């Protein structure tokens, strides 16, 4: 019964909860109140890297008129490694809803991160630029922008051209450093990726001034 389940779930681990609700889910897919209860339990227990949670969210986002479950679904797809599906849901949210500015900026950044994992680096950068147009001094956006450049470095031309991408990345990390919330991470990233800069001799033979 529901009362027994309510007594059990606070002490249950993720595996136990999935085991308890998986069969019930198969028989109760049209019971929206039941699905919302499962979603709440799994979310509160941080038990989101599993197929049950994805299945529950997939149904709820179809029947709920708000974007709440769609955002949860996109984030959960990302957490489970389904980056293309995650990108598609984030894209749909941005197209279909007039989001409040902070939420829109965060959704753009999450969309950019999904695109990064798909190796769609130029598209990912475009989304970070849109996020920064909303929040110009947002260190987290500059951090992600830098990490996108790092991720895509190996796909840029010859060895020299690949190393020059780290100039762009570190420039982003320097901008991120101005935001106290991410300052420590930004400084570590600067120290890590500055080591990959091309040396002066390499720059000279490639007709580029280091700076």
Name every feature range the model reports, one short phrase each:
Residues 46, 98-101, 113-119, 146, ...:
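Short coil/turn linking the two alpha-helices of tandem helical-hairpin repeats
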Residues 175-211:
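Terminal, low-structured helical/coil segments at or just beyond the last alpha-helical repeat
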């Amino acid at each position: 019964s529901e009362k027994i389940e309510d007594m059990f779930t606070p002490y249950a681990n993720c595996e136990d909860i999935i085991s308890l609700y998986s069969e019930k889910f198969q028989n109760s897919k049209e019971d929206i109140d039941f699905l919302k209860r499962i979603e709440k339990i799994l979310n509160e227990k941080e038990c989101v890297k599993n197929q049950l949670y994805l299945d529950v969210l997939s149904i709820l986002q179809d029947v709920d008129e708000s974007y709440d479950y769609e955002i949860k679904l996109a984030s959960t797809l990302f957490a489970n490694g389904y980056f293309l599906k995650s990108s598609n849901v984030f894209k749909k949210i941005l197209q279909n809803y007039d989001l409040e500015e902070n939420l829109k900026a965060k959704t753009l950044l999450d969309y950019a991160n999904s695109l990064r994992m798909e190796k769609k680096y130029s598209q990912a950068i475009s989304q970070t630029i849109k996020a920064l147009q909303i929040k110009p001094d947002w260190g987290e956006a500059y951090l992600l922008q830098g990490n996108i450049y790092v991720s895509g470095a190996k796909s840029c031309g010859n060895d020299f051209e690949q190393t020059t991408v780290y100039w762009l990345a570190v420039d982003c990390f320097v901008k991120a450093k101005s935001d106290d919330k991410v300052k420590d991470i930004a400084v570590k990233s600067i120290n890590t990726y500055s080591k990959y800069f091309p040396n002066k001799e390499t720059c000279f033979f490639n007709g580029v001034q280091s700076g």
